[in-house]
């Protein structure tokens, strides 16, 4: 990880190594670096190379004369802004979804799906699934679910997060907590699935 500014001489060395690599296809020797940047002492070049390595700008093998490798610049992580809605009760379905209280940014590489929103958890009914009070869940908007999915549901004017289960025999749908202190909730036609939980963010 690059964590420090470069001195003027270090910039010259990096620039020379890049140019040499582009022209020759392999890195320069210590002596060639000396000549390229106007230094007379190989030990001085060794010192600068050691600093560049510690700062994360190159990797090298001191036992080989041309074993220099520049560390490529990493592209900035692409972020996706999604609405962060108010608290959702994981213990009792007590809070309705309001307008987004704010937006939050998440790594697009981890959550490539579209139509996402986030909810902050309160309550403890999903602790056995590792969803704790204060966690932020990432939810993919969808109105259908499969057995075992953790869903956000709109229930009697309020919102809750539970595990979805539909009985294959009688068609009864339950929202099941992941905490033995709570009973499953049998849902009716007025219940609406708002989305499926696909991720979780936690601050320590």
From Swiss-Prot:
The gene is lexA. Pfam families: LexA_DNA_bind (PF01726), Peptidase_S24 (PF00717). Residues 30-50 bind DNA. SUPFAM superfamilies: LexA/Signal peptidase, Winged helix' DNA-binding domain. Gene3D superfamilies: Umud Fragment, subunit A (2.10.109.10), Winged helix-like DNA-binding domain superfamily/Winged helix DNA-binding domain (1.10.10.10). This is LexA repressor. Homodimer. The lineage of its organism: Bacteria, Bacillati, Bacillota, Clostridia, Thermoanaerobacterales. The active site is at residues 125, 162.
């Amino acid at each position: 990880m690059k964590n420090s500014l470069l001195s003027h001489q270090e910039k010259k060395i990096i620039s020379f190594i890049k140019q040499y690599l582009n022209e020759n296809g392999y890195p320069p020797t210590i002596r060639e670096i000396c000549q390229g940047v106007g230094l007379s002492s190989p030990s001085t070049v060794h010192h600068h190379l050691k600093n560049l390595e510690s700062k994360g700008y190159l990797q090298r093998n001191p036992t080989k004369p041309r074993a220099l490798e520049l560390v490529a610049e990493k592209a900035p992580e692409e972020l996706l802004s999604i609405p962060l809605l108010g608290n959702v009760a994981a213990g009792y379905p007590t809070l309705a979804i309001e307008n987004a209280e704010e937006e939050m940014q998440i790594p697009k590489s981890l959550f490539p799906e579209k139509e996402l929103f986030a909810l902050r958890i309160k309550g403890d009914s999903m602790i056995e699934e590792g969803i704790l009070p204060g966690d932020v869940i990432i939810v993919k908007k969808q109105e259908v679910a499969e057995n075992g999915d953790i869903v956000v549901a709109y229930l009697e004017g309020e919102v809750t997060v539970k595990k979805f289960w539909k009985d294959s025999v009688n068609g009864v749908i339950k929202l099941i907590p992941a905490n033995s202190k709570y009973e499953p909730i049998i849902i009716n036609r007025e219940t609406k699935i708002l989305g499926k939980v696909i991720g979780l963010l936690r601050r320590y």
